[in-house]
Structure formats: C-alpha cells, structure tokens
C-alpha cells in the first residue's frame, strides 16, 4: 500500500513479463519481504501499463512518506528516506546496506522511456503501527509538499542532485 499514490499494488515473486503486467515484482537475488537487519526487498513495477497506473506518478512520493508491505506473515511499515535516479545496470544502488532493513521500489524513468531507473528507498519504521487507508490518506493530505523533489542522480560514477517536479 502506497498511500501517496493511493495505490494497492500486488507483488509477485520474480520479474517475469507476466508478473510485471499484473503488478509489482520482487526482483530475484534481493531479500524476501520479511524485514530484518541486513535486508533490501526490491520491487519493480511499470510506470503505467495498458491503462493500469502502477507507479505512473512515482515522482509524487516524498521523503517521510509511508509504504506498507503486507505479507501472509506480517505487516511492515516503511518510511521513504531517499529518492534516486540511476542507470538501469547500476546494481550497487539496490544492494543490502549493512544493519539496515530497506524496501526499494524501482521503475523506469523518465515516464514513457526506460533510459534510467527511479528508485524510492524506504527504511523499516518499527515504531509505526499499520493504519487504515483513510488515516494514511489523511496523513498524505496533511504532509503534501508541491515543491520539486530533491533526487540523487548517479551517472557514470558521479553523483548530483536534480529537482523532479511532483506533477508530470
């Protein structure tokens, strides 16, 4: 559940064409969505797909936003801590970071192109209790910031900040 996008996105195991057409896909070689130190669960989704929004408006997500991951075993609440734009082959950006419990969403960037990847990196918030959708949406309304997002852009070993408008 991504409240800022008002999006319940089903997540499937493996980034196959079929799974990506139906929702988000847990990337192979990344952590299972169980939480815990030394994990990074990486979920890829299209930035829109044949009429389905999916992560179409990913640029609206802002630092501090909540993302809730529900599995058959647990409900984990994460808070967005970083926004990044990377090259498609930059696997370093999705590696486990020692001691951290991360959830990373990845999608194509810019919209309608696939020359880069837009990452939303969120860290587990063990003190946050799951809320109702209405409570989450109210929090989003209260915290909306229309200012451009400060996004870290990593290209060919260099890092820069770029402003990305929340509305495309």
What are these regions (language model features)?
Residues 1-168:
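Solvent-exposed, non-transmembrane regions of membrane-associated and secreted proteins
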